[in-house]
């Protein structure tokens, strides 16, 4: 059995997808939840769960251990969430084990706001106004970090006073009204195939106005909108040499779209299309430059997942852990005794239905009942 390493802030989705395709899995992440460990032969911790930050030393130590260990050789590693901010770490890791994904230099370039939005402008692809220097009137502007992830880096520019951009990854972007959306696609360094378009669940968390909390898809859009999104995906894949599963984030306001960024690694939205062949497709796209002719969803129903964040500090009791483990709609299940500060991710929920609105309602109802159970003293 070929062995594959998967890494990220959370490696659960990648670990389950790799196991589904018949790989032995070594998972590297911050949480080590029950689902991840069930799908993996080994688990390595690569950072403190509450920090949501990947520790470079731990990642490289884990990869080095995999190089040295006896038994089946690890064929490579797939970086997931959290690595879009770490091109230097991708380079260092690739020197130890083959990196099966977008190369470090391409990640660096696609996350450079000047180069990224320059490519969009050169191809007349719509996006919200951006600038490197602070606007004279910050009202209606966001301050973003091109190396950030999950929306935790986004702030209202007006709330931080006379902000100055301290490094090249920070930039200002005009807030655009509408629905937060994404396109899930796979690229081979030159061409790309669009898998589906999704709605994103985005919520304010304290001073952070746009924190990622989940996704719903595939959702139906007009043929014209799908064409424009597909054109943007193909232009960016070729311009930056993207490889493997990626996603394009954009805003939709009626018939208008505004491209926001590319996540140059397997996105959370890939879980909406859970089926055999996703990791096989990743390897073929990255190692052989082959794209699948098409990958229809295993179901025509709409799926959704949502991250459940702690509303206050809590410790997961054995009874609470048992409750989570017994629910088929709960994933990324933590172990009993796990402690969470306010704003920490606890687990995730899934639902499916005929429409995005139905799925959204099911997720919301499940979140309310779940939090009531976890916050009620046992």
What are these regions (language model features)?
Residues 1-110, 114-115, 341, 352-377:
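ATP-binding N-terminal substructure of ATP-dependent carboxylate-amine bond-forming enzymes
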Residues 177-240, 263-286, 294-300:
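ATP-dependent carboxylate/phosphate-activation module, predominantly the ATP-grasp catalytic core
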Residues 187-192, 252-256, 311-312, 352-354:
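Short acidic-glycine loop/turn motifs at beta-strand connectors
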Residues 242-254, 294:
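A short glycine-rich, hydrophobically flanked beta-strand micro-motif that places a catalytic Asp/Glu
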Residues 142-144, 185, 255-266:
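A short beta-strand motif that forms the metal-chelation/ATP-contact edge
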């Amino acid at each position: 059995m070929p062995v594959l390493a998967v890494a990220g802030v959370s490696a659960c989705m990648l670990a389950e997808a790799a196991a589904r395709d018949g790989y032995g899995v070594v998972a590297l992440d911050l949480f080590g939840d029950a689902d991840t460990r069930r799908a993996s032969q080994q688990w390595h911790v690569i950072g403190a769960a509450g920090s949501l930050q990947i520790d470079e030393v731990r990642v490289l130590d884990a990869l080095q251990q995999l190089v040295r260990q006896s038994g089946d050789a690890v064929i490579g590693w797939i970086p997931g969430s959290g690595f879009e901010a770490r091109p230097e770490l991708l380079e260092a890791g690739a020197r130890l084990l083959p990196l099966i994904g977008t190369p470090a230099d391409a990640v660096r370039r696609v996350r450079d706001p000047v180069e990224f939005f320059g490519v969009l402008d050169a191809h007349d692809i719509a996006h919200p106004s951006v600038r490197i220097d602070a606007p004279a009137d910050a009202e209606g502007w966001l301050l973003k970090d091109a190396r950030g992830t999950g929306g935790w880096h986004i702030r209202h520019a007006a709330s931080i006073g006379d902000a100055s951009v301290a490094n090249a990854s920070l930039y200002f972007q005009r807030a655009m009204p509408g629905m937060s959306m994404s396109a899930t696609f796979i690229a081979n360094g030159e061409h790309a195939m669009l898998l589906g378009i999704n709605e994103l669940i985005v919520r304010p968390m304290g001073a952070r106005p746009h924190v990622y909390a989940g996704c719903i898809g595939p959702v139906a859009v007009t043929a014209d909108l799908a064409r424009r999104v597909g054109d943007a995906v193909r232009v960016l894949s070729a311009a930056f040499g993207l490889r493997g599963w990626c996603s394009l984030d954009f805003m939709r306001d009626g018939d208008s779209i505004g491209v926001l960024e590319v996540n140059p690694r397997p996105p959370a939205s890939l879980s909406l299309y859970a089926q055999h062949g996703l990791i096989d497709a990743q390897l073929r796209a990255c190692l052989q430059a082959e794209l699948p002719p098409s990958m229809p969803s295993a179901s025509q129903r709409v799926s959704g997942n949502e991250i459940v964040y702690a509303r206050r500090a809590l410790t997961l009791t054995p009874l609470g852990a048992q409750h989570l483990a017994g629910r088929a709609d709960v994933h990324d299940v933590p172990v009993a005794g796990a402690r969470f500060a306010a704003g920490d991710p606890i687990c995730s929920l899934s639902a499916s239905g005929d429409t995005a609105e139905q799925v959204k309602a099911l997720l919301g109802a499940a979140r309310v009942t779940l939090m009531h159970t976890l916050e009620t003293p046992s």
